[in-house]
Amino acid sequence: MKKMLVEFRDFALKGNVLDLAVAVVIGAAFGKIVSSLVDNIIMPVVGVLLGGLDFTKLSVTVGKSVIQYGAFIQSIVDFIIIAFAIFIFVKILTSFMKKKEQPVEETPVPPTEEYLKEIRDLLKEQQKEI
């Protein structure tokens, strides 16, 4: 049992797992911020531009069921904003990574075949002298 706890601790404290946990927490908080932005700022402005439309009240009643397509539209706007923000973040991150990974100058590999030919020619000359 103790060995399993030690293995779990080692697994949980690996860099990738901790990075993922932090990313999930930050992502959840960012999602709440974007939802608030969409619900409280963007959609009311869009509603005013569309003639006083309140997206939170857009719905269709079918029998006893209520289909709230206004809330669905707000969720789509949420998704688009979050996806765009993630796209920009990844783009910036990859540009930093490319700058960090500057190409290492490769030392030219000596032309081994040329050296072998020179050695062969020198050996032939030495044999002629003997």
UniProtKB/Swiss-Prot annotation:
<dbReference type="GO" id="GO:0005886">
    <property type="term" value="C:plasma membrane"/>
</dbReference>
<keyword id="KW-0472">Membrane</keyword>
<dbReference type="InterPro" id="IPR037673">
    <property type="entry name" value="MSC/AndL"/>
</dbReference>
<dbReference type="InterPro" id="IPR001185">
    <property type="entry name" value="MS_channel"/>
</dbReference>
<feature type="transmembrane region" description="Helical">
    <location>
        <begin position="70"/>
        <end position="90"/>
    </location>
</feature>
<dbReference type="InterPro" id="IPR019823">
    <property type="entry name" value="Mechanosensitive_channel_CS"/>
</dbReference>
<protein>
    <recommendedName>
        <fullName>Large-conductance mechanosensitive channel</fullName>
    </recommendedName>
</protein>
<feature type="transmembrane region" description="Helical">
    <location>
        <begin position="11"/>
        <end position="31"/>
    </location>
</feature>
<keyword id="KW-1003">Cell membrane</keyword>
<comment type="similarity">
    <text>Belongs to the MscL family.</text>
</comment>
<keyword id="KW-0406">Ion transport</keyword>
<keyword id="KW-0812">Transmembrane</keyword>
<dbReference type="GO" id="GO:0008381">
    <property type="term" value="F:mechanosensitive monoatomic ion channel activity"/>
</dbReference>
<keyword id="KW-0407">Ion channel</keyword>
<keyword id="KW-1133">Transmembrane helix</keyword>
<keyword id="KW-0813">Transport</keyword>
<dbReference type="InterPro" id="IPR036019">
    <property type="entry name" value="MscL_channel"/>
</dbReference>
<comment type="subunit">
    <text>Homopentamer.</text>
</comment>
<comment type="function">
    <text>Channel that opens in response to stretch forces in the membrane lipid bilayer. May participate in the regulation of osmotic pressure changes within the cell.</text>
</comment>
<dbReference type="Pfam" id="PF01741">
    <property type="entry name" value="MscL"/>
</dbReference>
